[in-house]
Amino acid sequence: MMKMSEENLEVPFEFGECHAHIFMDGKNYKKAVERHKNGVDESVIRSHFACYQTQGIHFVRDGGDALGVSRRAKELAPEYGIDYRTPIFAIHKNGHYGKIVGKGFDTLKEYTALVKEVKTQGGDFIKIMTTGIMDFDTDGGITGEALRVQEVKEMVHIAH
């Protein structure tokens, strides 16, 4: 735990990263994916974790990926004193936003199988993609089409 001093007052604090994708590098998505194409490049994970350590980050909530990187990161995190939580991969409806960080489904039966797969692989939570992402070119609009409310309710019910 890091401490800062202000007028002889010791204030303990820890930092957390609450929206990470350990497989990405913040520079070039395609190159980041390419690094893990033939298997997880553990050096990328270790580099991120070493950086987190130096910055006092002890908690990471990852959004998952379809490459197995966050699954491996979950195994390595304790070596760095990091509490790492991941859904392993996000779940999206095919044809909607989410392909870059997860696996898709067409039917609720397929969705149910993906929920079971997350649990089998040791996921800490279920991440479902229900909308697109913010489109800053349209003053805060959302890209793509959101899922229907009833469908989202059923997905949440299945996940529980």
Language model features with spans:
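Histidine/acidic residue-rich metal-binding segments in metalloenzymes
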Residues: 109-160
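A generic secondary-structure micro-motif detector
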Residues: 37-38, 63, 104, 142-145
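Short, electropositive alpha-helical surface patch
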Residues: 70-84, 143-153
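Metal-associated gating/positioning segment near the N- to mid-region
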Residues: 10-76, 97, 150
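Short, surface-exposed amphipathic charged segments that create phosphate/polyanion-binding patches used
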Residues: 97-105
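Short, acidic/polar
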Residues: 41-49, 105-119
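Divalent metal-dependent hydrolysis catalytic cores, especially in the metallo-beta-lactamase
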Residues: 44-71, 81-92, 123-137
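Histidine-rich, glycine-flanked metal-binding segment
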Residues: 1-12
